[in-house]
Amino acid sequence: MHYRDLRDFIAALETRGELKRVGQPVSPRLEMTDLCDRTLRAEGPALLFEAPQTGNTRYASPVLGNLFGTPRRVALGMGAENVSALRDIGQLLAMLKEPEPPKGLRDAWDKFPLYKKVLDMAPKTIRRAPVQEVVEEGPEVDLARLPVWHCWPGDVAPLITWGLTVTRGPAKKRQNLGIYRQQVISRNQVIMRWLAHRGGALDFRDWRRTRPGEPFPVSVVLGCDPATILGAVTPVPDTLSEYQFAGLLRGSRTELTQSLGNDLQVPAFAEIVLEGHLSPCEAGFSGVSEHGIPLKEIDGYLHALEGPYGDHTGYYNEQDWFPVFTIDRLTRRPDAIYHSTYTGKPIDEPAVLGVALNEVFVPILQKQFPEIVDFYLPPEGCSYRMAVVSIRKQYAGHAKRVMMGCWSFLRQFMYTKFIVVVDDDIDTRDWKEVMWAITTRMDPVRDTVLVENTPIDYLDFASPVSGLGGKMGMDATNKWPGETDREWGRPIVKDAAVAARVDQLWQTLGL
């Protein structure tokens, strides 16, 4: 089933028993996080809070939380019925990432419908967009009227978490979609927390170089259809826009409308859009925001001190400086739904997303490394800091080649600290088997690869330097000649005929 907007998805989830409406007053300050966290850990439904209230303040917008709280709901959002079907999406992305020339006329004819479908999914623009039915400008913009979550007791301020940020570099036709958290620092300002390698930050870097001193346009979308949301967190090839990929997932072209104050396109059937800019400022400027947050000029633009916030690591992160997004205009539906989430100690909603998107990664890796049988990012490892890879080993040193390949092939794995490589007789998703392989097939000195001074997640306080740290690879495969001089162990295998007889006997024993 495919969904035109967030409301279509909500209705479908409710029909399936995958969404619960909460009519009692619940506060976006701490309470919604606690309720969603308990519900997620119980593998419960999405929650639609219909009466958000903090103290005497009642909010007009209902709040949607725990939307992608189970892998199945992620799959449904991507147009699939179950998580295993996401491998098909991964195969499509693998082909689009590195398309192979047709092997002949028949092969070209077989591939033509797929390429035509991709071309046919270019987004279309409409003028009268539901998301622009209500327009608030200038002094009318007040983020305090939105039920923005204050997720954890130690968080410095309310935080926009599911903002789909739309940017475009000065020399690019394609827009970039990214999801970056945004700290509220005044009625119309937030901090745009994006790391230097992310698409929005790269667009802003190019803008500063080519158009210094000019406001950088940004639009932030809150609450759009699931295909567009998930397209923004999927490793889409550079040749394909996220909007086009969302159309492929949905089975229909993404309907966009131009922002009223800039040339960025946003989903026409979204709930809320924040339009504005990153602000240039005078050299040497320093001050404080309306909410008392330190401000200063960096590279000609206004920045603010962000954090601390509870993060997906399960800890509060360090403070750092990021650019300030000034909101000139807020457009919305008359009865807009505010979509939010939280990040915390795994397993949280981003970790669940990681479990589902793991299935998308596997075919992409297999196209580059056909010897890979499975690839698993355990959610307990923050969904990206540890990977377990099983391979059909073919030569000495093969495991180390796969480690290096995984670290370098997709930018999504740049921050993976630990990679364990096992043989194809080991289930990567069964820790008992992985531990057995590590403890019986590994020598700690011979089979451990340590790499120093590599890019590391900025949030990883365990690294010796912010953004720079080590990586460890563990070769837990059976060793080949050249890797050991010793006779290698022969695994115990049950007699097949005896096992078959015992299978029959087992049914009669009542054990």
Swiss-Prot record:
Amino-acid positions noted as binding Mn(2+) in the UniProt annotation, renumbered to this chain: N176, E242
GO CC annotations on file: cytosol; plasma membrane
Gene3D superfamilies per UniProt: Single helix bin, UbiD C-terminal domain-like
Places the protein is found: Cell membrane
Alphabetic keyword roster: Cell membrane, Decarboxylase, Flavoprotein, FMN, Lyase, Manganese, Membrane, Metal-binding, Ubiquinone biosynthesis
Main localisation: membrane
Active-site residues from the entry: D311
Residues the entry annotates as binding prenylated FMN: I179, Y180, R181, R193, W194, L195, R198, G199
Reactions catalysed according to its record: a 4-hydroxy-3-(all-trans-polyprenyl)benzoate + H(+) = a 2-(all-trans-polyprenyl)phenol + CO2
GO biological process: ubiquinone biosynthetic process
Reported cofactor(s): prenylated FMN; Mn(2+)
Highest taxon, organism lineage: Bacteria
Cofactor note: Binds 1 prenylated FMN per subunit.
Pfam families: UbiD (PF01977), UbiD_C (PF20696), UbiD_N (PF20695)
EC number(s) per entry: 4.1.1.98
UniProt subunit comment: Homohexamer.
Family stated for the protein in its record: Belongs to the UbiD family.
Protein name: 3-octaprenyl-4-hydroxybenzoate carboxy-lyase
Name of the gene: ubiD
